[in-house]
Amino acid sequence: MVLTGNELWSKVQQALQHNLSKPTFETWIRPAICSGFRDGELTLIAPNSFASNWLRKNYVQTIEAAAAKIYGQPVRVSVQAQEEDSAERVLPPMASAPVPLPAAEATTASAAPSSGPRRILPGLNLRYVFNRFVVGPNSRMAHAAALAVAEAPGREFNPLFICGGVGLGKTHLMQAIGHYRLEINPEAKVAYVSTETFTNDLIQAIRKDGMQAFRDRYRATDLILVDDIQFIEGKEYTQEEFFHTFNALHEAGRQIVIASDRPPSQIPKLQERLISRFSMGLIADIQSPDLETRMAILQKKAEQERMMLPRDLIQYIAGRFTSNIRELEGALTRAVAFASITGLPMTVESVAPMLDPNGQGVDVTPQQVIDKVSEVFDVTPQDMRSSSRRRAVSHARQVGMYLMRQGTDLSLPRIGETFGGKDHTTVMYAIEQVEKRLSSDPQLASQVRRVRDLLQIDSRRRR
């Protein structure tokens, strides 16, 4: 059979698409391109060195077998890496008004197909699967690493440490790993737990003299997914217990996946031995998505809601909300709800006033609150997180807690953790003090308004 390299690779891809899971195919096989076919050797180019190494280790034999079957002769496969460029993705054309999608089309955004009943553990969100994760340059490395861990737990990257800002998809990827393993083995012992839950379970075990049961529970897992590990900072006993849990699981070859808003080395008051353990596998960073990725995220969200939106509206929302995916999807949800309630068409002109920063306001990150309050009150972010009782620092810290309660979805305990481990009663007191002083202290009111303006927090927002 006479085939060019591109023709052979296209046929191999078609064959493998039926034999591999969709996440595997879309992550490893589809992005690879053929750069040549000579003397029985098919040369493939992967997007980056990470992908090329994974293809060589795990899929070269599968590709060679498929190629030989199609070509009629043995085929050798070599894989090279090409660093990813910023090629622009092109979105398909969209209608100028919202149109419900047929039910059959809407199924394309569903979770990965299941071959039978599956066991979903408490805490795993059914929406957080690989098929629903939109991959962009900001998240390609983390997504590929997560899929690699899901396919071969305990082998390549253990632990896998995913870090990135609020609302960028860390929890989605973590839980997608859990869902994937449960698809492969419904009896797998998968545990998804926040650091807060781990700490609370530990406290209860100490109180009830149940430490052995606590250890047995966590160390019997095949896969443990630990979210928000940054909140372990300063908790010496929790760190001690987590260190031994980590060692027990790692020595048994069990996969550990950890998520944080910052790399291990930047978590304050974290034991050096934990920093070392967390860094011994792979640290995968997720950045804020670029415009094209944000547009793709909105389009997929619209498909899941069975709506087609005007391209200019997608572009407007993607350009307006830039810091994280959570606020991006929230803006789309508000826009769809607004159009449904008012009966107005889904156009930029109709929804822009509702999404204006002087109206509802947008979500901000805890770090943004700390940075802007520090700027206005002339203190440092380190001062804000410290235990300093200097009047200027104390007042700035209280305002930071007050605005963090207004501008984020963090609970009182989480806000306290962000400010260096303060408890929730301290946060409540700070909020009450600021609310009292705002009506009688014009200078404070002016400073708070300035921070609000910088953060685009509306004074009418919740809490």
From Swiss-Prot:
Entry-linked SUPFAM superfamilies: P-loop containing nucleoside triphosphate hydrolases, TrpR-like
Chain spans, region Domain IV, binds dsDNA:
340-463
Annotated region described as Domain II, given as residue ranges? 78-122
What keywords are assigned to this protein? ATP-binding, Cytoplasm, DNA replication, DNA-binding, Lipid-binding, Nucleotide-binding
Q: Give GO cellular component annotations, separated by semicolons.
A: cytoplasm; plasma membrane
Tell me the segments the record calls region Domain III, AAA+ region.
123-339
The organism sits in which domain of life? Bacteria
Entry-linked InterPro entries: AAA+_ATPase (IPR003593), Chromosome_initiator_DnaA (IPR001957), Chromosome_initiator_DnaA-like (IPR020591), Chromosome_initiator_DnaA_CS (IPR018312), DnaA_C (IPR013159), DnaA_dom (IPR013317), DnaA_N_dom (IPR024633), DnaA_N_sf (IPR038454)
Q: GO: which molecular function terms? A: ATP binding; ATP hydrolysis activity; DNA replication origin binding; lipid binding
Q: Which Pfam families match?
A: Bac_DnaA, Bac_DnaA_C, DnaA_N
Instruction: Provide the residue span(s) of the region labelled Domain I, interacts with DnaA modulators.
Output: 1-78
UniProt cross-references to Gene3D superfamilies, sorted A to Z: 1.10.1750.10, 1.10.8.60, 3.30.300.180, P-loop containing nucleotide triphosphate hydrolases (3.40.50.300)
Gene Ontology biological process: DNA replication initiation; regulation of DNA replication
Residue positions annotated to bind ATP are G167, G169, K170, T171
* Compartments in which it is found: Cytoplasm
Asked whether the UniProt record includes Transferase among its keywords, one would answer no
Q: What does this protein do?
A: Plays an essential role in the initiation and regulation of chromosomal replication. ATP-DnaA binds to the origin of replication (oriC) to initiate formation of the DNA replication initiation complex once per cell cycle. Binds the DnaA box (a 9 base pair repeat at the origin) and separates the double-stranded (ds)DNA. Forms a right-handed helical filament on oriC DNA; dsDNA binds to the exterior of the filament while single-stranded (ss)DNA is stabiized in the filament's interior.
Per the record, the domain comment is: Domain I is involved in oligomerization and binding regulators, domain II is flexibile and of varying length in different bacteria, domain III forms the AAA+ region, while domain IV binds dsDNA.
What does the annotation say about its assembly with partners? Answer: Oligomerizes as a right-handed, spiral filament on DNA at oriC.
Q: Which family does it belong to?
A: Belongs to the DnaA family.
What HAMAP family would the database entry show?
DnaA_bact
Which protein, by its recorded name, is this? Chromosomal replication initiator protein DnaA
Organism, per UniProt?
Answer: Prochlorococcus marinus (strain MIT 9303)
